[in-house]
Structures are given as C-alpha cells and as structure tokens.
Amino acid sequence: MVTSTGLLLLLGLLGQLWAGAAADSEAVVCEGTACYTAHWGKLSAAEAQHRCNENGGNLATVKSEEEARHVQEALAQLLKTKAPSETKIGKFWIGLQREKGKCTYHDLPMKGFSWVGGGEDTTYSNWYKASKSSCISKRCVSLILDLSLKPHPSHLPKWHESPCGTPDAPGNSIEGFLCKFNFKGMCSPLALGGPGQLTYTTPFQATTSSLKAVPFASVANVVCGDEAESKTNYYLCKETTAGVFHWGSSGPLCVSPKFGCSFNNGGCQQDCFEGGDGSFRCGCRPGFRLLDDLVTCASRNPCSSNPCTGGGMCHSVPLSENYTCHCPRGYQLDSSQVHCVDIDECEDSPCDQECINTPGGFHCECWVGYQSSGSKEEACEDVDECTAAYSPCAQGCTNTDGSFYCSCKEGYIMSGEDSTQCEDIDECLGNPCDTLCINTDGSFRCGCPAGFELAPNGVSCTRGSMFSELPARPPQKEDKGDGKESTVPLTEMPGSLNGSKDVSNRAQTTDLSIQSDSSTASVPLEIEVSSEASDVWLDLGTYLPTTSGHSQPTHEDSVPAHSDSDTDGQKLLLFYILGTVVAISLLLALALGLLIYLKRKAKKEEIKEKKAQNAADSYSWIPERAESRAPENQYSPTPGTDC
C-alpha cells in the first residue's frame, strides 16, 4: 500500500511539472472517449502533428457536427487565455490532409482528403470554399475563425485548405493547432463534499481543474480543508472491470459535518440526503440507480448512456439491463459489437473500372478517356474525342480505346506542346527545284525566270515558246539583180539553257543583230552573273558572214525577218556589251602593265644593292699608328705586273 501510494504521489508530482509549461498555452475538453486540446503556436502542419504525436495523439479530427462542437469549445477556452494582438482571422491546423499525387474528388464530402490518424471517411464536411483541383503538391486543412468574435454553436469553424507550410513559413494567419487523444474509457469527475482543491493531470500532460470526463490513467490531486489543515490525496483513474472505470474511492471527498449537503450538494450528482447526526448520503431520481462510487447516478435504461457509437442505434432488451446495437445501411458492427464501421463495398469489385468507397456506400468512376455507359453507373464506354464538335486536333484525329492521337497531312509536321497542331514544312529548304522554288501550304512548286518554262518533270526549266520563234540571226536579203530581194533562211537558236539552280541574278537571253556593209550576223547572247562569283560568262551563237550580203544557213529551217526596231535594240545592247568587254580589257591591261612595272623596279633595286655591297666590302677604317711601312692593300698592283 505504501508503494502504491508513493507511486501515485510520484506520478502526480511529475505530471504537475510536465504540465506547468503548457498550462497557460492550451485548453482541454474531454467528451465520450476522447480529449481535445487547443494550442497557440505558429507551426507548420508537420510540426503541429509532431507536437501532438509526442504526447500520444494526432491532429484533431472533425468527423461530425458533435465533434465540431467539442473542438469549438476547446478553441473558446483557448481564446480566453490570450488573443494575438491586431489579428482578426486565425487558422488552426487539424488532421485533414491530402498527399502529393492524390487528386481532388469534387463529388465527395472529403474531396479526396483523409485523416492523419486513420479511420473511415464520414459524410460530414464544412468547407470554407471549393477545394482546388491540384494533384502536384501536398495540401493541409485548418479551421478558420474570426478571433474578434466569440465562438457560437450556430457558427462552427470552417475548413480551409492550403499548403502545409514549412518551419520558416508556416502559412498565412496560422495561429495554432488542435490535438485529439483517444482513450479506452473515462472516469466521472471527483466530487468534493466540502472545502478543498482538485487538480487533474492527464496522460497527455495537461493540467486542469474542471473536466466533464477524466481520461483513463489520469491522476487527481485533492487537497481538503483550510490551508492550515490541508491534506493532499492522490487518486488514479483505472479500469475496475471490463468497460468500467473508477477512481477507487467511495463517497464524496473532503466531507465536513459542518456543511453537510449545503456545500456543493454534498458532492452528490442528483440528490443529497442529510442524517440527524450531521451525516448525509447521495441518492438518485426514479429511473436511475446509484453507482459504486456512491455519488454518481446511472439510468436504469441501458441505452440512456448512448453506448452505441459510429452511428449505431441502441435497442434495450425488455426486462433486463442488456441492449443491442444496430448499424445503418452500409455499416456493420466491429468486434466490440457497439461500434459501427463502414463496409468496403469495393472489395467485391462492383465497378467496371474504378471503385471509390464512401461512408455507407460507394460509387464508380471511369478512367480518363471513358465515360459512364447510359443509366449503368458501373459500366464505362470509350469517349470519342475525335467527334467533329470536340476534336482537339488541327487536321487528322484517330480515336483509340481511352485516348486518341493526331496526325497531319502530307507536307505538314506535328507541332505544339500537346502535339495537336500542324505546321507547314518548307520544302524549299532542301532545294528541290533547279531554279525557283515557291513554298505553299502543305506543298511547294517550282518556277522559272522569264522566257523559260517548266519541264515535264516539274523541276527543271527549258527555253520557252518565245525562244523557239526567234531566229538565231535576222533574215538576210539577197539581191538577184532584178531589183527584188528574197529572204534567206537563218540558223536556229541553240537548244537548252546551261543548268543553274541559282537563277535569281540571271539576265534574260536577247538576240542581238550586227549589221555591216557586207553582211548582217545575228548573235544570240546569254549573260549570267553568278551571286557567288564576279566573273561574267557569255554563251554566244556565232554565225559566219557571207561575202555578198548573203548569209549561209546552218540549218534547213527558215524564220521570218526581224523588224527594224528589233535590230536597233539589238545593236544598242551589243554596244553596251562590247563597251563592257573593252573596259574590262583595259583594266586587265592596266593591271598587267602595273605588275610589269613593279617587277622591273624591284629588279633594278636588287642590282643596285648588290653593287653597293661589293664596293663596301673592299674598304675598312684603319686607326693611325706609327709603322715602318704602309699596310697591304689587296687592290695595290703587284710588283712586276700591271695589276
């Protein structure tokens, strides 16, 4: 007994020490088999969950309107302790979260969120606004409330989803968090029948003097009498029998004959009856019975205490204190036979594709690219994305099971981030034409410069019909001596044009006519100036003049004579060309002359340098000194010779 008392005393003292730091920063509400605590603190959702978990709990759940009222009551107590200055809106984390990668289900009450402590989803929800359709980041839920207003049962705190925050940035307006602690049972509060002080220390290290229900394993510290006569007693809430929890004491505490029933109704829950000697006892009203603690009353109807949980209905057995629990549709009793749990209908695979279990039921969903088939929600059929009204493709669209793909016509390639658009291919970048290339939508066409026409292959160019009608030289007049002249057939123009892909700088071919006293010669002239070189090349068809004013044709065909105006134009163009040739020749001659001059000048300089070097090598300066004879000189004449 001494050991047990010492242990209780130690637990009480340690509990008071542990709870001292948190006493001014938390509020506690205990109902049913759970306790809720509200705390101040600007923390991220992960940090708040860690704080709750340290004491054996989790961030609070709000699965029903009744539970929402318990949480609101805890917040109301917390707001009485202190309120942040200049803060109107406050948010408090609860245990509702959605992991990264999970998406929003707008047709479900929980919107795809789940409770961190586990447990089935419920139909209750109280969203502040529509949930965001995001699957790429983790989202957490907090209770949002106006801190300037007193909490009212008709205005329960709303659910607000947001990012879960970090230690450095817990989130906008985050002021604290709520924890929930579950217990196997509760003890009734201890009753004081006389003056004294009562303090409870809970297993989650909260210290309070007023609880509607005290959780299992809590320690009660009772000090009776005045300060001079104070005596401390410790009591432990423990399970006496299965499902029955008791403090281990009988009757009211701190009873004093001096006060009797006048002080706190003698500590009795219902009725207090005084004896003639100053003693008193507790009693119960009709329909109730006194429990073993001799203070608390319980209904004789076993269902009066609502023993069935999880939405179960209690049905009493006639003429006995027994009862049975019945669950609503979609639920079943667990092993305790008093708690109803949801039936997971999806285990039987009732859906064609995706099955979503809901509280008390389920619903089917189709994969992306499918839709429900008619009135049967369980069946899914393929969605034809390629219908004319909804086709996402710019050109070709092919429907597949659950999806589709786009295609482009010949001459186009796929483009866009989602590969639904088509972009024209510029075929001219590959130089498919011998001359001109013109890109068009989905194709291209080749072209030719003036005077040429496209060959049957559609790529190269040939001389046009206007060239086939022009003579290689103008027709010549033959004088037969009778005063009449006859037309002499002329040669034809040469056939094909020298091939070149770059014809942008090609000049048109022009027939030139040169007349002289003895003959008239026609010179078909083609000039091409390359865009990559500065040389000029000529393709001239030359015809030999005749001696008597006649021209000798080189072919059998004859062509009609040119007009005088054509001849004048040809002469003028020939004059320009010959002038250009003469100018180029003069420039070449000038450059050649300059080169010869520079070479000769360099040669003369070289000869002068050689001569100066030979003369200088024969002489040197000799310092003055007295010598018997003059120094030898290799250029002095040798005695006996002339040199």
Curated annotation (Swiss-Prot):
One of its GO terms (cellular component) is cytoplasmic vesicle. Its main location: membrane. Residues 257-298, 299-341, 342-381, 382-423, 424-462 form the EGF-like domain. The modification Phosphotyrosine is found at Y619, Y635. N- and O-glycosylated. Phosphorylated on Tyr-619 and Tyr-635 by SRC; these phosphorylations promote endothelial cell adhesion and migration. The keyword Transmembrane helix applies. Residues 31-173 form the C-type lectin domain. SUPFAM superfamilies: C-type lectin-like (SSF56436), EGF/Laminin (SSF57196), Growth factor receptor domain (SSF57184). It comes from the Eukaryota. Homodimer. Interacts with C1QBP; the association may represent a cell surface C1q receptor. Interacts with surfactant protein A/SFTPA1. Interacts with multimerin-2/MMRN2. Interacts with DAG1; this interaction plays an important role in endothelial cell migration. Interacts with CBL. Interacts with IGFBP7. Interacts with VEGFR2. This is Complement component C1q receptor. It comes from Rattus norvegicus (Rat). The lineage of its organism: Eukaryota, Metazoa, Chordata, Craniata, Vertebrata. The gene is Cd93.
